[in-house]
């Protein structure tokens, strides 16, 4: 087991862990939040035919070179109709948004730029070819549009439907067990006794797991009993693809996750040189990847964002740009001095906002690792190198959390 390693080394070591990935066919209505297992190509041209981008008149542009031209109305082109009028010289057809372009027409006049007079229409504005949406200008039949590894959101779902697919092959959601440990933990809604606190980590971590496109399986709190912990880890290993624990990984007498992993598990490393989040443990329990996260809420979130999320995305075959990711690396200008951390990567919480000359980072709340409110008040983390202080005006690397 390696002890006290850099974040880059930790990422390299977790890269040796994995789980079996499977796929399944998912109906269109259930695709949001899923990851594509194979590329998707369009089954159709989009648009499928030349059509109007607005309500108005389908005309021949050569008939409308001057304002006040009067044309004979010869019919109407409606969306969904397969009966098209034909427009000849001196004629116009009513046309609705999305309706096919009548034969002979090559331009559209907006209805607001016309005056209808019986069976004639006076053209008061220009005829514009640009108001016509051309066949296949958005998508071409057979064109590959979405690569494997794409996280499907609302826009992707609509696009998949537009391409003619009623289902898609997706990565089966891996099951991630989430286990909080500690005698002091009580479920929200129960009145606290002296020395107790509400259990929050499993809810936050489960939400992060779900946001990555995986399925979280929350376990009941495991109190500080090594037999109970062993039983719970065994159950998690047999029913999950990966295990997240929070608490019990530091150097105290009751840090049982670390003790049990060292005695009976297969630990890869313990302690990463970051602040906050320094004492994470990683390895395998009964062949199942296990991440032992710190008990402090902020530390557990930071370790998940910087270590677990990239690993989970890779194991699910996520595309590096279109797949799930919870943070993007950006450059920001510090608006204030930030003290770094001796020998550790400083991941201070920051609020990233657009400034006049780029992204600006500020801090807004107390930075204690137990203050989960600071993760709400901020939307980023600094990446200040070890033994380095950040000065106001410095341009630094940061994670912009999504």
Where are these regions (language model features)?
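Helix-rich terminal scaffold detector
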Residues: 3-7, 166-293, 297-303
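Flexible glycine/proline-rich
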Residues: 24-29, 37, 80, 262-402
